[in-house]
Amino acid sequence: MEFLMDPSIWAGLLTLVVLEIVLGIDNLVFIAILADKLPPKQRDKARLLGLSLALIMRLGLLSLISWMVTLTKPLFTVMDFSFSGRDLIMLFGGIFLLFKATTELHERLENRDHDSGHGKGYASFWVVVTQIVILDAVFSLDAVITAVGMVNHLPVMMAAVVIAMAVMLLASKPLTRFVNQHPTVVVLCLSFLLMIGLSLVAEGFGFHIPKGYLYAAIGFSIIIEVFNQIARRNFIRHQSTLPLRARTADAILRLMGGKRQANVQHDADNPMPMPIPEGAFAEEERYMINGVLTLASRSLRGIMTPRGEISWVDANLGVDEIREQLLSSPHSLFPVCRGELDEIIGIVRAKELLVALEEGVDVAAIASASPAIIVPETLDPINLLGVLRRARGSFVIVTNEFGVVQGLVTPLDVLEAIAGEFPDADETPEIITDGDGWLVKGGTDLHALQQALDVEHLADDDDIATVAGLVISANGHIPRVGDVIDVGPLHITIIEANDYRVDLVRIVKEQPAHDEDE
């Protein structure tokens, strides 16, 4: 027991424990990679069994100290190379590491055996355990030989190995979880395995590669990977601040081969969607899906029929005037008002109004039996759907905070917001192709314009819902006829406008430089 009082013994023990743990970290990473080939229920068992068998093997190697020392004696010579037992172990161990690392890299780069898709094939339990033992033997051989040269007491060496292995057993599961959550770390560690395997093969042929070179390369790579993980964490934190709806829409549109949403970026660790075959999804399908996914983020002002385009019946007019208005209009439903649009009495079908006129019934009395459903302009389109269901085929009047009518919304307006425009008989399309540009009404929904012209993120302010609002915001005031306003890639020329609003514009889209070269 006197040797236990020797400080050099404890210093040697501590040094060996640290050495075994440091040299065992890369071993643990590769054990985690091998265990991932097994079904989830067997991974912990394989990891513990493999490390336990490796511990027994290390203790056995330490017990053969005298024999291991003789491994440096040459056994035979081939050409100018002399091979000892240690050289052969290094050579074949290095070849095994090179083969294993190359195979793993190929499988991961080809995306094999790592997807949770249909029919994932798992490796045999004992095959993986055997590979873990062999891998540990290759990694531990150099450390064991180093330990023999550092300490003269076999019990001290065995104690260091047991302590280090206990630490490895405790750290194996958290490290495995970390490796599985970070695919780039796996590829980095496999590249380390290639370097270590190459150094072992070189040493087997008698070419000594200073360990400092390997440790410097590994350390530098680890620092770069740490920066990569920090950047990825910051990226995920930034993405988490974006609306879940925007991220979901981006993923679905990318899956269908459409353009991604503005401000939504991609994580390099996440695979890009598979190429979409030509014609797999029609442009109309992409348009409608985009409309559905972005419906909740849009304003009622971009969906509704604006105040200036509402056809309404003035109850104060004569019978003949009302009849003429009803017969000349393609609409089947009218708001009945008293003198002005803001004085709404009710919503009545044209057929009922014509019958009332023939029978001499007061139009206002008929309208008062069907009061209008009024919603604020701040209501989002998703909640509007419930209001339209309760309206039972009627439309909904949209007002501002002062009760002034801003427009009306019908079920058809919601459908147009999703599937595109369905103009009435008395309407012209909101967007018309005109040579190398487009004629666009001022009240056109900004989202519809972006879809039709294949542009994104024209307005920074979410309150801007129409083309007129866009040009007024960009210009700072209501522009005059002939003014040209540039918004992103669009050159907008004012065609019709007055002191209060913009009615018609002509838009020319600037083509990207690479398109012009083509």
Curated annotation (Swiss-Prot):
Primary location class: membrane
Segments on the Cytoplasmic face: 1-13, 70-78, 146-149, 206, 376-518
Top-level taxon of the source organism: Bacteria
Intervals, Periplasmic compartment: 35-48, 100-124, 171-184, 228-354
TM region positions: 14-34, 49-69, 79-99, 125-145, 150-170, 185-205, 207-227, 355-375
Subcellular location per the Swiss-Prot or TrEMBL entry: Cell inner membrane
Domain CBS: 304-363, 367-427
InterPro entries (UniProt xref): CBS_dom (IPR000644), CBS_dom_sf (IPR046342), FAD-bd_PCMH-like_sf (IPR036318), FAD-bd_PCMH_sub2 (IPR016169), Integral_membrane_TerC (IPR005496), Ion_transp-like_CBS (IPR044751), Transptr-assoc_dom (IPR005170)
Any one cellular-component term (Gene Ontology): plasma membrane
Annotated membrane topology: Multi-pass membrane protein
Pfam families, alphabetized: CorC_HlyC, TerC
UniProt KW keywords: CBS domain, Cell inner membrane, Cell membrane, Membrane, Repeat, Transmembrane, Transmembrane helix
A GO molecular-function descriptor: flavin adenine dinucleotide binding
Recorded family membership: Belongs to the UPF0053 family.
PANTHER family named among the record's database cross-references: HEMOLYSIN-RELATED, UPF0053 INNER MEMBRANE PROTEIN YOAE
Name used for this protein in its record: UPF0053 inner membrane protein YoaE
Organism for this UniProt entry: Escherichia coli (strain K12)
